[in-house]
Structure formats: structure tokens, C-alpha cells
Swiss-Prot record:
It comes from the Bacteria. It is a multi-pass membrane protein. The chain crosses the membrane at residues 10-30, 136-156. GO terms for cellular component: plasma membrane. Signal peptide: none annotated. This is Uncharacterized protein MG319 homolog. The lineage of its organism: Bacteria, Bacillati, Mycoplasmatota, Mycoplasmoidales, Mycoplasmoidaceae. It comes from Mycoplasma pneumoniae (strain ATCC 29342 / M129 / Subtype 1). Its main location: membrane.
Length: 193
């Protein structure tokens, strides 16, 4: 009985982990709950929050770290990112326009633009890099977030079930003590009879 209980708990945690991981991917990578199972590049996700326009707005206006744009602007930005990605694929010698360069905070980092012009990346990383950024990193992040979420939910559920079990045990003990008291009070009367 204990083995089946453990098996059921593990299966429940596995399903919960997958569900939370899927939700993580749907929010941050697919952009929809019913995706076509094509993961976006992490730079696309990065640019949703730290695009050149957003960084420029932060530096010029002096507002906080987050900048919220209207939905139409966000849609046009995502369309521009897709076009930029296609341009990069066609012309490998030019800089990747998805990376914020001119007028952004990143251009102030020493060697940032030079690195983009001629990135000195090992051959092994050049081969593995696309798989890392497109599949391994997002799936790994989703799995970790799924595990953390599943463990948190499991902890909350175990606390609730323990509280219910304790309440039932207390009620059972109270009922048993009432029954014992009744029989204890009735015993002398029976003897008299």
C-alpha cells in the first residue's frame, strides 16, 4: 500500500513538473498557451524587456528599470525582430541587429561592439551554441522552474493534508473519550443492579 502511495505521489509530481515547465515555456518562449513547438531564441525574449528602444527610453526619461510599451508597439517590435533574424541569416558579415548597439547602455561596455563584429568563439561552442541557446537552456530553465514549482505545491498540499489528518485524529480521540466516559459512568450502575 505504501509503495503504491509513493508511486502515485511521484507520478503526480512528475505531471505537475511538466505542467509548470510547459507554462514557463508558454509564457517566456512560445508567447501562447497553444504553441507550434518552435522555441524562440533567448535574444528575442531578452529584447522584449531590454530592447534598444526600451533602454533608450529608460536613459532619456529617467523612469525606473521597467518600460511598458503599448500592444501595437510590442507586436511591431516582434515583427521587426523576425525580419532582423532573417537579415542576419542572409548576411553573416554584418552585425546582428537584434543586439542593442547605438545609443544603448550596452554600447558603453568596453569591447562589446568589437566582439559583435568579430566574435572570438571556440569552434566547439559555435557548433553547440545554437542548440544551447535554442533548446537546452530554455528547456533546462523550464525543467528547473517546474521542479521548484512542483516542490512548493507538494509542500503546501502536504501541510494541508497533515492539518486535516490531525483534525480527524483529534475528533476521533474526543469521540473515543466520550464513549469511555459513558461506559465508566455506567459501570457502577450495572453493578448495583
Amino acid at each position: 500500500m505504501g509503495f503504491f502511495k509513493l508511486l502515485f505521489k511521484l507520478a503526480f509530481l512528475a505531471v505537475l513538473t511538466v505542467a509548470i515547465a510547459y507554462l514557463f515555456l508558454a509564457i517566456f518562449y512560445f508567447g501562447t498557451v497553444s504553441p507550434s513547438f518552435k522555441l524562440a531564441q533567448p535574444m528575442d525574449v531578452f529584447n522584449r524587456f531590454f530592447s534598444k528602444e526600451a533602454l533608450d527610453t529608460v536613459t532619456t526619461s529617467g523612469v525606473g528599470a521597467t518600460v511598458t510599451a503599448p500592444k501595437a508597439a510590442a507586436a511591431s517590435q516582434s515583427h521587426a525582430l523576425i525580419l532582423a533574424a532573417e537579415q542576419v541569416a542572409n548576411n553573416a558579415n554584418k552585425l546582428d541587429p537584434r543586439f542593442p548597439i547605438d545609443g544603448s547602455l550596452f554600447s558603453q561596455i568596453p569591447g562589446y561592439v568589437d566582439f559583435l563584429k568579430k566574435p572570438n568563439i571556440p569552434a566547439f561552442l559555435e557548433k553547440v551554441g545554437p542548440y544551447l541557446t535554442k533548446y537546452i537552456i530554455p528547456l533546462g530553465m523550464a525543467l528547473v522552474s517546474g521542479l521548484i514549482g512542483a516542490l512548493i505545491i507538494n509542500f503546501i498540499l502536504s501541510k494541508i493534508t497533515r492539518a486535516i489528518i490531525k483534525k480527524r485524529r483529534k475528533a476521533k480521540r474526543a469521540q473515543q473519550s466520550r464513549v469511555d466516559d459513558y461506559y465508566y459512568d455506567e459501570a457502577p450502575r450495572r453493578r448495583r443492579r
